[in-house]
């Protein structure tokens, strides 16, 4: 493969198709409402620093992302989740 052909095709050994679309974990488990008490599931949608991850990182659908945000904020208010990470506080 010449250098010009490699550049046009995206390089040597590149995948022909894009990355696979992520499936919403709440839709896959048929969960209608995100529960603020389900801390393990909420932590999967948060960064190490305690920030809420965007949809493009988690693969959650728009409906569940809105309810996920509310659930995380409720869990923070009830002291089930931290507002910031422990290493940042000290």
Curated annotation (Swiss-Prot):
Record GO terms (molecular function): small ribosomal subunit rRNA binding; structural constituent of ribosome
Organism, scientific name: Roseiflexus sp. (strain RS-1)
GO BP terms in the entry: translation
Pfam family, one: Ribosomal_S18
Protein's name according to its UniProt entry: Small ribosomal subunit protein bS18B
GO CC terms in record: cytosolic small ribosomal subunit
Family: Belongs to the bacterial ribosomal protein bS18 family.
Function: Binds as a heterodimer with protein bS6 to the central domain of the 16S rRNA, where it helps stabilize the platform of the 30S subunit.
Keyword Ribonucleoprotein: yes
Family matches, as PANTHER family: 30S RIBOSOMAL PROTEIN S18 (PTHR13479), SMALL RIBOSOMAL SUBUNIT PROTEIN BS18M (PTHR13479:SF40)
Gene3D superfamilies reported in the protein's UniProt record: Ribosomal protein S18 (4.10.640.10)
Keywords on record: Ribonucleoprotein, Ribosomal protein, RNA-binding, rRNA-binding
Tree of life domain: Bacteria
Subunit structure: Part of the 30S ribosomal subunit. Forms a tight heterodimer with protein bS6.
């Amino acid at each position: 493969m010449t250098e010009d052909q490699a550049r046009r095709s995206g390089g040597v050994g590149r995948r022909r198709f894009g990355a696979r679309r992520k499936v919403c974990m709440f839709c896959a488990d048929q969960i209608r409402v995100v529960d603020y008490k389900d801390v393990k599931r909420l932590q999967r949608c948060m960064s190490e620093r305690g920030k809420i991850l965007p949809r493009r990182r988690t693969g959650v659908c728009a409906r569940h992302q809105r309810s996920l945000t509310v659930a995380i904020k409720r869990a923070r208010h009830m002291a089930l989740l931290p507002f910031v990470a422990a290493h940042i506080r000290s």
